[in-house]
UniProtKB/Swiss-Prot annotation:
GO biological process, one term: enterobactin catabolic process
Protein name: Iron(III) enterobactin esterase
Entry EC no(s): 3.1.1.108
GO CC annotation, single: cytoplasm
Reactions that this protein is recorded to catalyse: Fe(III)-enterobactin + 3 H2O + H(+) = Fe(III)-[N-(2,3-dihydroxybenzoyl)-L-serine] + 2 N-(2,3-dihydroxybenzoyl)-L-serine; Fe(III)-enterobactin + H2O = Fe(III)-[N-(2,3-dihydroxybenzoyl)-L-serine]3 + H(+); Fe(III)-[N-(2,3-dihydroxybenzoyl)-L-serine]3 + H2O + H(+) = Fe(III)-[N-(2,3-dihydroxybenzoyl)-L-serine]2 + N-(2,3-dihydroxybenzoyl)-L-serine; Fe(III)-[N-(2,3-dihydroxybenzoyl)-L-serine]2 + H2O + H(+) = Fe(III)-[N-(2,3-dihydroxybenzoyl)-L-serine] + N-(2,3-dihydroxybenzoyl)-L-serine
Organism placement in taxonomy: Bacteria, Pseudomonadati, Pseudomonadota, Gammaproteobacteria, Enterobacterales
Gene3D superfamilies: alpha/beta hydrolase (3.40.50.1820), Immunoglobulins (2.60.40.10)
Keywords linked to the UniProt accession: Cytoplasm, Hydrolase
UniProt xrefs under Pfam families: Enterochelin_N (PF11806), Esterase (PF00756)
GO terms for MF: enterochelin esterase activity; iron ion binding
Phenotype on disruption: Mutant is unable to produce linear DHBS compounds.
Family of this protein: Belongs to the Fes family.
Source organism per UniProt: Escherichia coli (strain K12)
Length: 400
C-alpha cells in the first residue's frame, strides 16, 4: 500500500483528531495535528500554534507554554506529548502571527496568566475533532478521552427528555438584575416530594453542555430519583465573580425570590436533605457557602474544583470559608457534601485538601474525590452526575 504524502488531501482525510499509541500499561504517546489554511511556510503568516490543554499545558501548571512544530514544506503542524491511560480533558489550538508572547525563557505564574489571557480569545477547537463546545472562558474547546478514562454516568447513553426544559426570566429585586433560569423536571413522582437541585453556571449546563438527556437517562435507569432541576445563569464573568464567592445577597435572593417562582411552575420538596446545590470553581465555593449558612434549606452540597483559596489568589493564606470553619463561626454538621478536585489544578487541590482535613470529623457524610484532570468541564460533567447519584442515594431507601 502506497504511503500517503504528508499534508496531501488524502492524508488529511485520514486524520480524525489526536492519535495515540500505548507506551506501557499506564501511558500513551499522543500526537495533535493542525492544518494551516494558508499552506506551507512559504505562504503562511502563522508563526506559532499554541497548544492549550487543560491541566497539562495551561496556566495552572506554571510550566513552559507549548507550541506545535511545522513539518517543513507542508501545511502540517504537529505536537506530541505523553498522557496517562485514564486521562480526560479539553484542549484548543491558538494559531497566531505573533512570536513575542511568552518570549521570556521561564515565565512566572503571573506572566503565564497574562500571556494566555491575550491569546485565548483567538483559540479554536480542533477542526479534526467532532466533539467540541464553547468553554467557560468563552472560547471553543475539544474533548480528548484516553482509553481507560473513568466512566461518566449517563453521558454514555443520553436519552431525549419527554418534556423540554422551561426557560424563564428572573427579575431580582434584591440583586437589581434580570437573568435566565432553566427549570427541568424528570419522572412522575408526587410533586411535593420531588427533590430539588440548584445548578450554578446554568447557561453552561443548559446550552454549551446540555444535561437534559443525561438526567433523563439516569432517571429512567433509576440511578437518579424524579426531581426538579433549576439552572441559574451567571450573566457574565463580572457578575459571576461578584455574586458567587460568599455572597449572602445572592443566596437570599435565590431563597426569597427565585425558589417561590420555580415552585409555582414545578413543585418540589422543602426538605433540606432532598435539596442539592451544585457548582464548579467559584460555584463550588458558593455551593458550600450556601450549605454552611442555610443548612435548613440546602442540606446537600456538590462542590467541584471549589475556589476555597478565595479571596487570596496567591494561595499563601487560607480562604475565608476555611477560616470560618476553624473559628467555629459555621459548621458542616448535618450536611452531606461531595468535594471533588483535580490533581492537575495544584492551587485548588491544595485548598480542597485543607478543607477536607477540616471537615474530616464528619467524614461519614463526605464524598471526597481526586480526579486525574484539571479545571475542566469535561471532567466536571461526570462528577456532577455521580455527585447527584451519591447525594440522593438515601432517597431510594426512603421509598423502599
Amino acid at each position: 500500500m502506497t504511503a500517503l504524502k504528508v499534508g496531501s488531501e488524502s492524508w488529511w482525510q485520514s486524520k480524525h483528531g489526536p492519535e495515540w499509541q500505548r507506551l506501557n500499561d499506564e501511558m500513551f504517546e499522543v500526537t495533535f495535528w493542525w492544518r494551516d489554511p494558508q499552506g506551507s511556510e512559504e505562504y503562511s503568516t502563522i508563526k506559532r500554534v499554541w497548544v492549550y490543554i487543560t491541566g497539562v499545558t495551561d496556566h495552572h501548571q506554571n510550566s513552559q507554554p507549548q507550541s506545535m512544530q511545522r513539518i517543513a514544506g507542508t501545511n502540517v503542524w504537529q505536537w506530541t506529548t505523553q498522557l496517562n491511560a485514564n486521562w480526560r480533558g479539553s484542549y484548543c489550538f491558538i494559531p497566531t502571527e505573533r512570536d513575542d508572547i511568552f518570549s521570556v525563557p521561564s515565565p512566572d505564574r503571573l506572566e503565564l496568566r497574562e500571556g494566555w489571557r491575550k491569546l485565548l480569545p483567538q483559540a479554536i477547537a480542533d477542526p479534526l475533532n467532532l466533539q467540541s463546545w464553547k468553554g467557560g472562558r468563552g472560547h471553543a474547546v475539544s474533548a480528548l478521552e484516553m482509553p481507560q478514562a473513568p466512566l461518566q454516568p449517563g453521558w454514555d447513553c443520553p436519552q431525549a427528555p419527554e418534556i423540554p426544559a422551561k426557560e424563564i426570566i428572573w427579575k431580582s429585586e434584591r440583586l437589581k438584575k434580570s437573568r435566565r433560569v432553566w427549570i427541568f423536571t424528570t419522572g412522575d413522582a408526587t410533586a411535593e416530594e420531588r427533590p430539588l437541585a440548584v445548578l450554578l453556571d446554568g447557561e453552561f449546563w443548559a446550552q454549551s453542555m446540555p444535561v437534559w438527556p443525561v438526567l433523563t437517562s439516569l432517571t429512567h435507569r433509576q440511578q437518579l430519583p424524579p426531581a426538579v432541576y433549576v439552572l441559574i445563569d451567571a450573566i457574565d464573568t463580572t457578575h459571576r465573580a461578584h455574586e458567587l464567592p460568599c455572597n449572602a445577597d445572592f443566596w437570599l435572593a435565590v431563597q426569597q425570590e427565585l425558589l417561590p417562582l420555580v415552585k409555582a411552575i414545578a413543585p418540589f420538596s422543602d426538605r433540606a436533605d432532598r435539596t442539592v446545590v451544585a457548582g464548579q470553581s467559584f460555584g463550588g465555593l458558593s455551593a458550600l457557602y450556601a450549605g454552611l449558612h442555610w443548612p435548613e434549606r440546602f442540606g446537600c452540597v456538590l462542590s467541584q474544583s471549589g475556589s476555597y483559596w478565595w479571596p487570596h489568589r496567591g494561595g499563601q493564606q487560607e480562604g475565608v470559608l476555611l477560616e470560618k470553619l476553624k473559628a467555629g463561626e459555621v459548621s458542616a454538621e448535618g450536611l452531606r457534601i461531595v468535594l471533588e478536585a483535580g490533581i492537575r489544578e495544584p492551587m485548588i487541590m491544595r485548598a480542597n485538601q485543607a478543607l477536607y482535613a477540616q471537615l474530616h470529623p464528619i467524614k461519614e457524610s463526605i464524598f471526597w474525590r481526586q480526579v486525574d484532570g484539571g479545571h475542566d468541564a469535561l471532567c466536571w460533567r461526570g462528577g456532577l452526575m455521580q455527585g447527584l447519584i451519591d447525594l440522593w442515594q438515601p432517597l431510594f431507601h426512603d421509598r423502599s
